[in-house]
Amino acid sequence: VRLPTEFYQRVRADLRQRLDAAEIDGVLVTHPADVAYLMGFFYAVTERPVYLWFGTTPGGDFCVVPHLDVEYAAAQQVDIDLVAYPEFPGVVSAEQHLAEALTVRGLAGARIGYTTGVSVATLDSWQQLLHGSTFEPFTGIAAMRAIKHPEEIYFHEQAAEVCDDMLRAGRALIEDAWRREQTLPTEGEIARHVITFGTEEMYRRFDHVIFTTKLAGGLVYAGPNAARPHGLPSSRRLQAGDTLILSLGAAAASRFVESERTFILGEPSDQQRRYFEVTATAQRVGTDAMRAGRTCAEANQICLDVIRDGGLGEHIRHRQGHGIGLQNHEGPWLDDGDDTVLAPGMFLSCEPGVYVPGHGGYRISDSVLVTEGAPRRLTAYPRSLEENVIA
């Protein structure tokens, strides 16, 4: 699984233009997702740093990597010069190798951009080793990643299919136990089952799997536990009458997708119907609000106002959604505090929720592509109450 060379050429040309516009000589990249985006290098993240230098001069780019990753980078057809350092912390540090590589390329006094997420300690070490250089934040890569290319959308589509199948696998596990009159599974058992299913499906579809964090994952919570939006799966066993949230994700070529559904175990009560329908309406209205030209804050308000108007505002615990890409959570953010204007090619979750302490939670999430026209859901698992009753 590797995006075509043309993709990386296009991305790098865009980045050089942004560097020129910012009047800086280059950018130091440290985040694994940014490294993967610019050079197609996916690696196991440890204490050993990886530093990518990308400059305005073609041919001068390089990546500082631990020696143990050199062959693996070559196997991924990385076409940027590698500067290997022996080990961490090393007699000569990775930062010293970086400074030397910049110096021999005549960049010791360069204007250097750095991406968000760089630690204070790392930035301080760069400044001490490169006295003549100036450093300033650079957000251009985040802006680039927010707009998905067609090659990326293809892998998001593949991940969406797997993610929907993970929901089916989780439901089937519960239904099978119920049909056989066996003990219902625990939250943890369901989580293990769907994650294993999703991971195996990725290996079945692709001959060489690459990822920045994981191939498949998920949160599973039922009954009162479902009132905690990001609670971890527990050993609690499902019971008739429970509300169950399957919050699942998958990634193809490290392009993520999430698909989340709320299920009712047995005949829904009037209370469950009300909570579910308000959530489903907010999700439908919120998805339609994700149109090019509207701000993230405006879409968020339109979505969550459905819950407030339904008399359930006190049970809101989070924003409408977030960007998805090489990370499961990335900008832009569908939140009151983000005035980013939605644009075609942006890919975000729409996941409003209602959480009632002591009772349960309700959340429906799709991964949505912003287009020139109507928003496009890539995830397609059924959303209605009738289709999500397990009986």
PLM segments and residue spans:
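Active-site neighborhoods and metal-handling regions in enzymes and metal-associated proteins
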Residues: 1-391
